[in-house]
Amino acid sequence: MKPQPFTLELSNCQLRHDGGAADKDEVRMVNVRWIDGFMVNSVSNENAGYLANTRADGASHIFLALSTNDNNTLNKSNKIVPADPQQNRVPLVEKAVDGGIFTYYIGYVTPAPEKATSGPLTSWATWELVYN
């Protein structure tokens, strides 16, 4: 996997509580939950969460995988499986004024490199913002 970073950026939102002095510096519960995607039919835990190609005329035997870091090795500590209630999360990095950034990674994976073919690769994944 050769992961590339992408970000989800929040703006114009208050991340710190504005209540009493005791909780003024507490960061609100803000996180991203991946809830769906065009995933391969999982036959093992290894390929759970892989995003399949939506193009019939595109690359074959190659998938996309979401992860929490830029490691070239994808494993249970960094792989994101959409809709998994125990999915790995990334921390919110606060911006100086009213906002924050979540940084994720996406890369190509293949369980059978000898069968992989080149071509366009398109897929999708859906996320939701949880803000308490």
UniProtKB/Swiss-Prot annotation:
Keywords: Fimbrium. SUPFAM superfamilies: Bacterial adhesins. Its main location: other. GO terms for cellular component: pilus. InterPro entries: Adhesion_dom_fimbrial_sf, Adhesion_dom_sf. GO terms for biological process: cell adhesion. It is found in: Fimbrium. The keyword Signal does not apply. Gene3D superfamilies: Fimbrial-type adhesion domain. Appears to affect the stability of the intact fimbriae on the cell surface. This is Protein MrkF. The lineage of its organism: Bacteria, Pseudomonadati, Pseudomonadota, Gammaproteobacteria, Enterobacterales.
